[in-house]
Amino acid sequence: LEDFERHGQKLPLIVLLDNGSTEEDIVALMQAKIYDIEIVVLDHHFPGELITKTLKSGETIDGSTECNNEDIIAGTVAVDEYVDTHVNPYLVGGDSQITAGALATEVAHIINPDVEDLVKHLPAIAVLGDRAEADEVEQYVKLASEKGYDREQLKKIAECIDFEAYFLRFMNGRGIIDTILGVDNLDKHPKMVEALYKEYLKRVDTQMKAALPNIKRVKLENGIYFNVLDVE
Protein backbone atom coordinates (compact mmCIF):
# COMPACT_ATOMS: atom_id res chain seq x y z
CA LEU A 1 0.00 0.00 0.00
CA GLU A 2 2.89 2.36 0.75
CA ASP A 3 4.43 1.66 -2.68
CA PHE A 4 1.05 2.33 -4.28
CA GLU A 5 0.64 5.67 -2.52
CA ARG A 6 4.24 6.85 -2.90
CA HIS A 7 5.23 5.42 -6.28
CA GLY A 8 1.97 4.64 -8.03
CA GLN A 9 2.77 0.93 -8.25
CA LYS A 10 -0.06 -1.48 -8.95
CA LEU A 11 -1.80 -3.11 -6.02
CA PRO A 12 -1.19 -6.86 -5.77
CA LEU A 13 -3.59 -9.58 -6.81
CA ILE A 14 -4.26 -11.73 -3.74
CA VAL A 15 -4.76 -15.43 -4.47
CA LEU A 16 -5.94 -17.46 -1.47
CA LEU A 17 -5.45 -21.23 -1.74
CA ASP A 18 -7.17 -23.73 0.55
CA ASN A 19 -8.64 -20.82 2.48
CA GLY A 20 -11.01 -17.89 2.07
CA SER A 21 -14.44 -19.44 1.44
CA THR A 22 -15.95 -19.33 4.91
CA GLU A 23 -17.71 -16.59 6.85
CA GLU A 24 -14.74 -16.50 9.25
CA ASP A 25 -12.70 -15.02 6.37
CA ILE A 26 -15.06 -12.12 5.71
CA VAL A 27 -13.40 -9.53 7.98
CA ALA A 28 -9.97 -9.98 6.39
CA LEU A 29 -11.45 -10.02 2.88
CA MET A 30 -13.49 -6.90 3.62
CA GLN A 31 -10.38 -5.04 4.77
CA ALA A 32 -8.56 -5.92 1.55
CA LYS A 33 -11.51 -4.79 -0.59
CA ILE A 34 -11.60 -1.42 1.17
CA TYR A 35 -8.18 -0.86 -0.45
CA ASP A 36 -9.58 -2.02 -3.83
CA ILE A 37 -7.30 -5.07 -3.89
CA GLU A 38 -8.44 -7.84 -6.23
CA ILE A 39 -8.93 -11.22 -4.55
CA VAL A 40 -9.15 -14.72 -5.99
CA VAL A 41 -10.18 -17.62 -3.73
CA LEU A 42 -9.53 -21.28 -4.57
CA ASP A 43 -10.91 -23.37 -1.73
CA HIS A 44 -12.73 -26.64 -1.12
CA HIS A 45 -14.03 -26.12 2.41
CA PHE A 46 -17.75 -25.76 3.07
CA PRO A 47 -18.52 -22.06 2.40
CA GLY A 48 -21.87 -21.97 4.15
CA GLU A 49 -25.33 -22.36 2.69
CA LEU A 50 -25.84 -21.05 -0.84
CA ILE A 51 -27.60 -17.68 -1.02
CA THR A 52 -28.60 -18.17 -4.66
CA LYS A 53 -28.43 -21.07 -7.10
CA THR A 54 -28.21 -20.77 -10.87
CA LEU A 55 -29.49 -23.88 -12.63
CA LYS A 56 -28.68 -25.45 -15.99
CA SER A 57 -31.95 -24.01 -17.28
CA GLY A 58 -30.57 -20.52 -16.67
CA GLU A 59 -32.99 -19.89 -13.83
CA THR A 60 -31.62 -18.37 -10.61
CA ILE A 61 -33.41 -19.44 -7.45
CA ASP A 62 -33.17 -18.78 -3.74
CA GLY A 63 -30.51 -20.86 -2.02
CA SER A 64 -33.05 -22.43 0.33
CA THR A 65 -35.08 -23.83 -2.57
CA GLU A 66 -34.60 -27.58 -2.95
CA CYS A 67 -33.09 -28.88 -6.19
CA ASN A 68 -30.73 -31.58 -7.44
CA ASN A 69 -27.07 -30.70 -6.91
CA GLU A 70 -26.36 -31.91 -10.45
CA ASP A 71 -28.55 -29.08 -11.79
CA ILE A 72 -26.52 -26.31 -10.11
CA ILE A 73 -24.02 -24.55 -12.39
CA ALA A 74 -23.30 -21.56 -10.13
CA GLY A 75 -24.04 -20.46 -6.60
CA THR A 76 -23.29 -17.53 -4.35
CA VAL A 77 -22.29 -17.46 -0.68
CA ALA A 78 -21.55 -14.79 1.91
CA VAL A 79 -17.89 -14.18 0.98
CA ASP A 80 -18.72 -13.51 -2.67
CA GLU A 81 -19.51 -9.92 -1.77
CA TYR A 82 -15.82 -9.40 -0.99
CA VAL A 83 -13.98 -11.46 -3.63
CA ASP A 84 -13.56 -11.00 -7.36
CA THR A 85 -13.29 -14.67 -8.29
CA HIS A 86 -14.36 -17.60 -6.13
CA VAL A 87 -13.64 -21.21 -7.10
CA ASN A 88 -15.19 -23.82 -4.82
CA PRO A 89 -16.85 -27.16 -5.73
CA TYR A 90 -19.75 -26.41 -3.37
CA LEU A 91 -20.77 -23.50 -5.62
CA VAL A 92 -21.59 -25.93 -8.42
CA GLY A 93 -23.23 -28.67 -6.36
CA GLY A 94 -20.01 -30.48 -5.45
CA ASP A 95 -18.27 -31.15 -2.17
CA SER A 96 -14.85 -31.01 -0.52
CA GLN A 97 -13.40 -34.10 -2.23
CA ILE A 98 -11.92 -32.04 -5.08
CA THR A 99 -9.23 -30.45 -2.95
CA ALA A 100 -7.68 -27.00 -3.21
CA GLY A 101 -4.41 -28.40 -4.56
CA ALA A 102 -6.27 -30.12 -7.38
CA LEU A 103 -8.31 -26.99 -8.11
CA ALA A 104 -5.20 -24.81 -8.19
CA THR A 105 -3.47 -27.17 -10.63
CA GLU A 106 -6.50 -27.19 -12.91
CA VAL A 107 -6.61 -23.38 -12.91
CA ALA A 108 -2.85 -23.20 -13.58
CA HIS A 109 -3.29 -25.50 -16.56
CA ILE A 110 -6.13 -23.37 -17.92
CA ILE A 111 -3.98 -20.23 -17.61
CA ASN A 112 -0.91 -21.87 -19.13
CA PRO A 113 -1.51 -25.17 -20.98
CA ASP A 114 2.25 -25.53 -21.51
CA VAL A 115 2.69 -26.66 -17.89
CA GLU A 116 0.46 -29.71 -18.31
CA ASP A 117 3.21 -32.34 -18.20
CA LEU A 118 5.11 -30.54 -15.44
CA VAL A 119 2.16 -30.45 -13.02
CA LYS A 120 -0.02 -33.41 -14.04
CA HIS A 121 1.00 -35.41 -10.93
CA LEU A 122 0.27 -32.60 -8.44
CA PRO A 123 -3.51 -33.12 -8.11
CA ALA A 124 -2.91 -36.75 -7.09
CA ILE A 125 -0.54 -35.61 -4.34
CA ALA A 126 -3.15 -33.09 -3.18
CA VAL A 127 -6.12 -35.46 -3.05
CA LEU A 128 -4.19 -38.29 -1.41
CA GLY A 129 -2.64 -35.91 1.10
CA ASP A 130 -6.12 -34.68 2.02
CA ARG A 131 -7.45 -38.27 2.08
CA ALA A 132 -10.16 -37.40 -0.41
CA GLU A 133 -12.56 -40.09 -1.57
CA ALA A 134 -14.09 -39.56 -5.00
CA ASP A 135 -13.98 -40.95 -8.53
CA GLU A 136 -11.69 -38.08 -9.48
CA VAL A 137 -9.06 -39.34 -7.02
CA GLU A 138 -8.47 -42.46 -9.10
CA GLN A 139 -8.40 -40.40 -12.28
CA TYR A 140 -5.71 -38.15 -10.82
CA VAL A 141 -3.69 -41.15 -9.59
CA LYS A 142 -3.87 -42.62 -13.09
CA LEU A 143 -2.61 -39.34 -14.57
CA ALA A 144 0.31 -39.33 -12.14
CA SER A 145 1.18 -42.90 -13.12
CA GLU A 146 1.92 -41.58 -16.61
CA LYS A 147 4.89 -39.81 -15.03
CA GLY A 148 6.01 -42.93 -13.19
CA TYR A 149 4.46 -42.24 -9.78
CA ASP A 150 2.52 -44.96 -7.99
CA ARG A 151 0.03 -44.40 -5.15
CA GLU A 152 2.56 -45.07 -2.38
CA GLN A 153 5.08 -42.63 -3.85
CA LEU A 154 2.40 -39.96 -4.11
CA LYS A 155 1.34 -40.49 -0.49
CA LYS A 156 4.98 -40.29 0.59
CA ILE A 157 5.42 -36.96 -1.20
CA ALA A 158 2.24 -35.63 0.42
CA GLU A 159 3.53 -36.59 3.89
CA CYS A 160 6.85 -34.88 3.15
CA ILE A 161 5.07 -31.70 2.09
CA ASP A 162 3.09 -31.61 5.35
CA PHE A 163 6.25 -32.34 7.34
CA GLU A 164 8.26 -29.58 5.65
CA ALA A 165 5.38 -27.09 5.83
CA TYR A 166 5.29 -27.57 9.61
CA PHE A 167 8.87 -26.32 9.87
CA LEU A 168 8.60 -23.61 7.23
CA ARG A 169 5.53 -22.02 8.85
CA PHE A 170 5.20 -18.69 7.03
CA MET A 171 8.71 -18.65 5.56
CA ASN A 172 9.21 -18.79 1.80
CA GLY A 173 10.32 -22.34 1.05
CA ARG A 174 9.51 -22.42 -2.64
CA GLY A 175 12.82 -23.99 -3.66
CA ILE A 176 12.63 -26.97 -1.34
CA ILE A 177 8.87 -27.42 -1.87
CA ASP A 178 9.39 -27.48 -5.65
CA THR A 179 12.07 -30.14 -5.16
CA ILE A 180 9.81 -32.28 -2.96
CA LEU A 181 6.95 -31.98 -5.46
CA GLY A 182 9.19 -32.90 -8.37
CA VAL A 183 8.65 -29.76 -10.43
CA ASP A 184 12.24 -28.47 -10.12
CA ASN A 185 15.69 -29.84 -9.24
CA LEU A 186 14.51 -33.22 -10.48
CA ASP A 187 17.87 -34.85 -9.83
CA LYS A 188 17.50 -33.98 -6.12
CA HIS A 189 13.82 -34.98 -5.87
CA PRO A 190 14.18 -38.70 -4.96
CA LYS A 191 16.90 -38.09 -2.35
CA MET A 192 14.98 -35.22 -0.78
CA VAL A 193 11.76 -37.23 -0.47
CA GLU A 194 13.52 -40.27 0.99
CA ALA A 195 15.48 -38.20 3.52
CA LEU A 196 12.45 -36.25 4.70
CA TYR A 197 10.21 -39.31 4.82
CA LYS A 198 12.63 -41.21 7.07
CA GLU A 199 12.77 -38.24 9.44
CA TYR A 200 8.98 -37.91 9.31
CA LEU A 201 8.53 -41.55 10.35
CA LYS A 202 10.96 -41.10 13.25
CA ARG A 203 9.04 -38.07 14.52
CA VAL A 204 5.68 -39.84 14.19
CA ASP A 205 7.00 -42.85 16.09
CA THR A 206 8.30 -40.63 18.90
CA GLN A 207 5.01 -38.75 19.17
CA MET A 208 2.94 -41.94 19.12
CA LYS A 209 5.01 -43.47 21.92
CA ALA A 210 4.41 -40.35 23.99
CA ALA A 211 0.70 -40.07 23.19
CA LEU A 212 -0.64 -43.63 23.28
CA PRO A 213 -0.11 -44.27 27.02
CA ASN A 214 -2.16 -41.15 27.79
CA ILE A 215 -5.15 -41.88 25.59
CA LYS A 216 -8.47 -42.54 27.29
CA ARG A 217 -10.63 -44.91 25.25
CA VAL A 218 -14.41 -44.90 25.54
CA LYS A 219 -16.72 -47.30 23.73
CA LEU A 220 -19.93 -45.62 22.57
CA GLU A 221 -23.32 -47.32 22.42
CA ASN A 222 -23.05 -47.73 18.65
CA GLY A 223 -19.82 -49.71 19.05
CA ILE A 224 -17.49 -46.92 17.94
CA TYR A 225 -14.45 -46.25 20.11
CA PHE A 226 -13.89 -42.59 21.05
CA ASN A 227 -10.29 -41.78 21.94
CA VAL A 228 -9.50 -38.71 24.06
CA LEU A 229 -6.03 -37.22 24.52
CA ASP A 230 -5.50 -34.37 27.00
CA VAL A 231 -2.80 -32.17 25.45
CA GLU A 232 -2.67 -29.61 28.26
Regions found by a protein language model. Give the residues of each.
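Generic alpha-helical structural element
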Residues: G93-S96, R169, N185
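Gly/His-enriched, cation/cofactor- and phosphate-binding structural elements
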Residues: K10, M171, G175-E232
